[in-house]
Amino acid sequence: MTPFGISVPASSGNVGPGFDSTGLALGLYLHLNVEDANSIQFYSDGESTPTENHFIWNIAENIANKHGIRLPACKVQETNEIPLARGLGSSASAIVAGIELANQLGNLHLTPEQKLQYGTEIEGHPDNVAPSIYGGLVISTVLEKEIEHIQLRDIDVDIVAYIPNIELKTSVSRNCLPDSYNRDYAAKASAISNLTIAALYSKDYKLAGKLMEEDLFHEPFRSELIPNFAYIREEAKKYGAFGTILSGAGPTMLSITPKGNGPTLQNNMSKLSLLADYQVEYIPIDYQGISIQE
């Protein structure tokens, strides 16, 4: 076996009002380095992990089983830059990594569409797995058993993330959402989402940022779970942000700011006393998606 590497970017789901349908790939990565070995070995950040208990390996075996093959003995070393349970798509990145691990070890020659299909079946929705596979901003939905998606690869903004030192499970954040919305409310929420995507495509980032903060699907309900939600949004605007939103289900928040302003915004926000325990990071948008290093 020729050694190879797999890199999968983080992702931010929803991007404001694009609830369960829009995601953005971000330049934090889950890396797998794979080499030949006499037995199956898996290491996470240098620590040996039993493969039967490892999520990524279990995903890889599941995909291999679908194709009627067994994965060969190998040594897999995982390193992960993506914070867990922070709304940055850590589970989706792990799913995509497992799918690609099976693809490479089993010579399955999976298409991106097949990877998206498998990832969506496992994750339950495509808004995080899609950008981790394709890169950029991806709008996607499941129609019957078919997944449709559109990718936007040219977004002239910078991203600054505010990552608190707390975890928030998606299941907890999802439980605070209403079971249904009345027709007028849903129509307005849908219109805001549609106009946000149109603004991004037309590069009207000022309008896009304004609309992102007008989400009605999830942020009004989840914001109560997020420390300093209103404060971060207000302060970021003072330093030039177009808008500030929850990343996925939270607790991380993201600011969209003019191209070139990211480092300045990051520097100013990191000095705020209320954010002393946060990682305030300027994170580039990833446009490559999953990548293989040989």
UniProtKB/Swiss-Prot annotation:
Query: Could you name the Gene Ontology cellular component terms for this entry?
Result: cytoplasm
Q: Report the catalytic activity.
A: L-homoserine + ATP = O-phospho-L-homoserine + ADP + H(+)
InterPro entries according to UniProt: GHMP_kinase_C_dom, GHMP_kinase_C_sf, GHMP_kinase_N_dom, GHMP_knse_ATP-bd_CS, Homoserine_kinase, Ribosomal_Su5_D2-typ_SF, Ribsml_uS5_D2-typ_fold_subgr
The reply to whether ATP-binding figures as a keyword in the UniProt entry is yes
- State its location(s): Cytoplasm
Alphabetized PROSITE patterns for the sequence: GHMP_KINASES_ATP (PS00627)
> Does the UniProt entry include the keyword Transferase?
yes
Instruction: Please state the protein's primary subcellular location.
Output: cytoplasm
UniProt KW keywords: Amino-acid biosynthesis, ATP-binding, Cytoplasm, Kinase, Nucleotide-binding, Threonine biosynthesis, Transferase
E.C. number: 2.7.1.39
An individual GO BP term: threonine biosynthetic process
Function statement: Catalyzes the ATP-dependent phosphorylation of L-homoserine to L-homoserine phosphate.
Concerning PANTHER family, the annotation shows: HOMOSERINE KINASE, HOMOSERINE/4-DIPHOSPHOCYTIDYL-2-C-METHYL-D-ERYTHRITOL KINASE
**Which protein family is named in the record?**
Belongs to the GHMP kinase family. Homoserine kinase subfamily.
Q: Per its record, how is this protein called by name? A: Homoserine kinase
